[in-house]
Amino acid sequence: MFILTMGLNHHTAPIDIREKLVFKETEEEMALITLLQEKSILENVIISTCNRTEIVAVVDQIHTGRYYLKRFMANWFQMDMEKIEPYLFFHEEKEAVNHLYKVTAGLDSLVLGETQILGQVKHAFEIAKQTGTTGTLLNKLFREVVTFAKKVHHQTKINENAVSVSYAAVEVAKKLYGSLENKKIVLVGAGEMSELALQNLAGSGIADITIINRTKANAEILADQFQAKVGTYEEMNNYLSIADIVLVSTSADEPIIKQKDMQILMSQKSTSMLVIDIGLPRNVEHDCSYIPNFHLYDIDDLAGVVSANSLERQKIVLALENTIETEVQNFFEWEKQLGVVPVIRALREKALEMQEITMTSLENKLPGLTEREYIQIGKHMKSIINQMLKQPISELKEMSVENDAPTSIEHFKRIFGLTELDITLSEKTQEQAETRS
């Protein structure tokens, strides 16, 4: 089994490609199940955010796994494989695990050190686990990377004062207008990005803030926090006609601000308008950028501002490289030891079987034993067995990560009289126990 990651992100693909390859949350379970049915795919998790679409998979062979991952992407999004392929990246085994650690900790994000991706990765794993597309390897891996990312944010404080996309949006507005005093702003969408933007706008002298959202209750909650007004979708163009700045961030699948509407609106408007679209797929039709005085920015346009991350946080990233390498090494040592788990289980079961035989013999030879005495003897015998097995099992685990592991394990099995039948029966017993639980 091999760990293989395939994806595209803000490093490898422009926004006009990324927005075509986003998995809708409502279809994610079906996508996971469909991918699992592909040849070579044994486990999978799909991570799909505004800046990346990545699939982490366990495959039986690397070369067939790569092909079937690409084929799945092409089929799911109904695009030619040749059109997608130039934007895809692949990471195998240690590179794949290293990459996932960095992604989850926010070290590969457009916004270095941001914590939003941690929640997104955790959510992606939970959906895959509930859907039944993860197994032993990915369950262990994702638990480890989530725990690591939480520790990184807590111990290094890399996320403190992180330059966010919403911050960058506000900086672009300041650059265009010089001062935001007395400006009118409209926020379309009432999610986390809008809330962050409002926090960054605090104290800038904005004269008028209007929040528009399909679910009015969500807009009202945000409006109460920032003394803003609430508008409706039906009246959106009326609010835009008097706005200086518009920030758009919704989960809509198609643009909600159309070129034909904006052409009319801007022809009747005497002032310019800055529109910042941080939705993916994009919420504003790209052709709007050709309208005079309509200044349109999308996520990729904000990258230059975001890249102004502090030198101090960059140092933290470099310092974490060695820590991540250690985590990756530990994971693969654990994976190697998986191969001896059935052997250990069979050894324990054989020892317990011998205990049961001995206890039965003891009961027959010493019928005068009380129940309490019988139980105490059984406990002591089990303790002796555990102590006797502790060192051999520890040595077996050490053998499993050495170069000649297969030969050493075979010697171990022969010394303790373990047959393939013993191991097979032990595995079946374990499977039955897991099914019952």
From Swiss-Prot:
Listed Pfam families: GlutR_dimer (PF00745), GlutR_N (PF05201), Shikimate_DH (PF01488)
Highest taxon of source: Bacteria
UniProt-listed Enzyme Commission number(s): 1.2.1.70
Biochemical pathway: Porphyrin-containing compound metabolism; protoporphyrin-IX biosynthesis; 5-aminolevulinate from L-glutamyl-tRNA(Glu): step 1/2
Keywords: NADP, Oxidoreductase, Porphyrin biosynthesis
Residues that hold substrate according to the record: 49-52, 109, 114-116, 120
Domain characteristics, as noted in the entry: Possesses an unusual extended V-shaped dimeric structure with each monomer consisting of three distinct domains arranged along a curved 'spinal' alpha-helix. The N-terminal catalytic domain specifically recognizes the glutamate moiety of the substrate. The second domain is the NADPH-binding domain, and the third C-terminal domain is responsible for dimerization.
Protein name: Glutamyl-tRNA reductase
Species the sequence originates in: Listeria welshimeri serovar 6b (strain ATCC 35897 / DSM 20650 / CCUG 15529 / CIP 8149 / NCTC 11857 / SLCC 5334 / V8)
Gene label: hemA
